[in-house]
Amino acid sequence: MSSTQGATKIPAEASSAAVRHMRRWEGVAVLVATLACWSSVPLFVRHLAEYIDHWTNNGWRYGASALFWLPAVLWALGRGALPRSIWRAALVPAVANTLAQVAFTSAHSYVNPALLTFGLRLQLVAVALGAYLLFPSERETIRSARYLCGLGLLVAGIAGVLLGGGNLGEGSNALGIALAIAAGMGYGVYGLAVRRFMYGFHPVYAFGVIALYTGSALVVAMLAFGRGHGAEVLELGSRELWYLGLSAFLGIAVGHVLYYTAIDRMGVAVTAGVLQLQPFVVGSMAAVLLGETLSAGQWLGGMVAVAGAALVLSAQKAAERRRARATALEEAEAAGESSAR
């Protein structure tokens, strides 16, 4: 995760010793579990959209998630492991996360969850634009032919998914598409904000603080705008209550723990690459469980979009390898000059 300059860093060995002893098959299992958790959330939220409004959905799910993360934050505070600067650093990421979450959840009332999750790939466009402006060291990568080709395929593919349903003229569908785009771009801004402001903080503590801010904001929004000020959830049947609880537990609480563990064990590139399969998993399950399907043209557009995303990720990975080789060469030359003296 990312941060303000001068933030207190948590040594890697303090956070990932157990992960480093994890077998590769265990790392793969964690990554698959992450994909399963995050693929289940759009299905739960889409089902619940028939029973509660999105303000109530967000307030209860993120409120419960904030309570889940609260003990970790309090434990870190008690040990003196939580720098005071983290509270200010987390404000911008939390605002971006809150707005993106509102768009994400409300979109489920209007569009197929598979269409929405394909639309979320647009976060890579927001990340590219933001990284070009904020991180000069990445401009060469973003200007590369592979990266730009990937972005082009991504945008073209997502346009095929969003516009290929044949009913864009319907107001509700147009609103859903706009919300899907807003959610994708919003999560991209959130990722940039995390990288810019949260660098150096332990990822679990960083997300814990962001979850507290986001949960508090969404609970306040629920009380202000939700039907019955959020009390509508008390009218849900036992099955829908289970779905609401599972969507919070699997998607926000456990899902993020698994995600960070997968990154630590399998690496960012592998983790991000596997998670590009999410729209296909969601689309398949939505067809089976909800009877909601995409057209053949939309599936084709989705495949083009994911291929573009994979090309972008491969360009980033190639740039990381080049930087690592350059750093190793500089260190070797410095060591040689030192020994010559």
Spans of features found by a protein language model:
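C-terminal-most transmembrane helix of multi-pass membrane proteins
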Residues: 2-13, 20, 62, 137-138, ...
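Glycine-/small-residue-enriched transmembrane alpha-helix faces in small-molecule transporters
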Residues: 2-59, 92-95, 99-106, 151-152, ...
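Hydrophobic alpha-helical transmembrane segments of multi-pass integral membrane proteins
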Residues: 25-33, 55-72, 88, 126, ...
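Specific transmembrane alpha-helical segments of multi-pass solute transporters/efflux pumps
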Residues: 37, 42, 73-120, 155, ...
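Membrane-interface helix-cap regions at the ends of transmembrane helices
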Residues: 43, 47, 51, 65-83, ...
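Specific alpha-helical transmembrane segments that line the substrate/conduction pathway
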Residues: 56-67, 105-142, 183, 268-287
